[in-house]
């Protein structure tokens, strides 16, 4: 297994969560979340984050319906991933993110009750789940 640094994004139209992980350990942790204007982040903040962490790969969560079909937000997440690649030249992987927000909310509630459920924390925790599920798939 490679020792790559990987950043994951949980794309949303109002907020985008971010997590960081190491492929060699298969672990991830929440970094931050960015406000978004109708799905468009502050690209300067994204650039600063990518320069700081210098990931070898960026994983973007792909919001699918429960039956695996695409929804309008799926195309927007793909566009976000394409823009990340185009602007910053980073390698991109897309990862099914079904139920990641539900799982993130449950995990945060278990650790801190309702006070832990602010939007930024949920989005960053969702990015962790997206990255961990990507690690699990790579491990086979």
Curated annotation (Swiss-Prot):
Domain of life of the organism encoding this protein: Bacteria
Major subcellular site: cytoplasm
UniProt GO BP: rRNA 5'-end processing
Locations listed in the record: Cytoplasm
EC number(s) per entry: 3.1.-.-
Enzyme class: hydrolase
An example Gene Ontology molecular-function term: nuclease activity
Keywords of the record: Cytoplasm, Hydrolase, Nuclease, Ribosome biogenesis
Pfam families: RuvX (PF03652)
InterPro entries referenced in this protein's UniProt entry, alphabetically: RNaseH-like_sf, YqgF, YqgF/RNaseH-like_dom, YqgF/RNaseH-like_dom_sf
GO cellular component: cytosol
Family, similarity comment: Belongs to the YqgF nuclease family.
Functional note: Could be a nuclease involved in processing of the 5'-end of pre-16S rRNA.
The protein's name in its UniProt record: Putative pre-16S rRNA nuclease
Organism: Yersinia enterocolitica serotype O:8 / biotype 1B (strain NCTC 13174 / 8081)
Lineage summary: Bacteria, Pseudomonadati, Pseudomonadota, Gammaproteobacteria, Enterobacterales
Gene designation per UniProt: yqgF
